[in-house]
Amino acid sequence: MTGLALDANLGGLPPQALLDAVAGLDPEMLRRYPETAPLERVLAARFGVDAERVLVTAGGDDAIDRICRARLRPGRSMVLPVPSFEMMEHFARLAGGAVVPIPWTRGPFPLDAIRRAVGPDTGVVVVVSPNNPTGAVATAADLEGVAEAAGPAAVLLDHAYVEYAAGDLTARALALPNVIVVRTLSKAWGLAGCRVGYVLGTPTAIDALRRAGAPYPVAAPSVALGLARLAAGERDVRDHVTRVRAERAALCQRLTALGLEPWPSEANFVLVECGPRARALMTGLAGRGVRVRAFPGRAGLETALRISLPGAAAAFAHLLGALDASLGAGAAS
């Protein structure tokens, strides 16, 4: 088997039919500026909302960037449970905003701490659920509490990994006027290379986000592939998610048996505390063709590794074998 890239939380392979969609693209599409409205209408229908409540973006990153540009400036702040997706802080600071970190590790969602942190200068409150890199989730009650505490500030609900979780907060979020939902086709839908994300919010919020970034954010072939991906249905997505959930449980069991400490996760990855064995384990895995993610310099994560789940039997067996061999080769000292 060739190397396993288990450091980027990739989804499963999209269906073969998408290659037919690529072959059938109209060359005229390539010389015209792209139109995202057809994809926005399809996404709106999926969630039972008007198209004016949907904005297609260049992946989730573009969506987060637009929210920060629209809501933050010098003197305004983002309340951010940490550890979190690194681009949150990056885009907040690019927009001139400050970041107010709220620790969220193995315990429940830090709703009370967020309530205390929100103030007149708060522009954005972030809820990443499932959280990256921990895999922890917030509940509907948590989201409602954040929305109430945020007042006029925007609540950014990052749902990039929600297909892998037991619960989906999108429907509840759509009933809360200050919540903006970020979702993507990059993870469970397998289109990371196309850079297709989207935002759900009120018409006023969506209009502001549309104006906060460049026009034509998503290339025409990516829009076409997004439409084809959704038209192909969800059966393969559900099958992929089922495999990943089974792998997640099995990986946590194996890591525990090996004397490591996996964090509970509802995403397509597991964060594992390795203690003094972290460096040796990462080196051992790399030597066996398995790349995982380390977090040097990230407070509280210095000796943790994040392992993506491949969603494929042969690849998962290779991962387990590499773990056993790496620890047996000296990482367990």
Q: What spans do the regions from the language model cover?
A:
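Conserved PLP-binding catalytic core of the aspartate aminotransferase-like
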Residues: V244-R245, T256-R288, L309
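N-terminal small-domain helix-loop-helix segment of the aminotransferase-like
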Residues: M1-D62, R66, S333
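Short acidic capping loops at alpha-helix termini that bridge into adjacent secondary structure
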Residues: D50-V54, G75-S77, D121, H159, ...
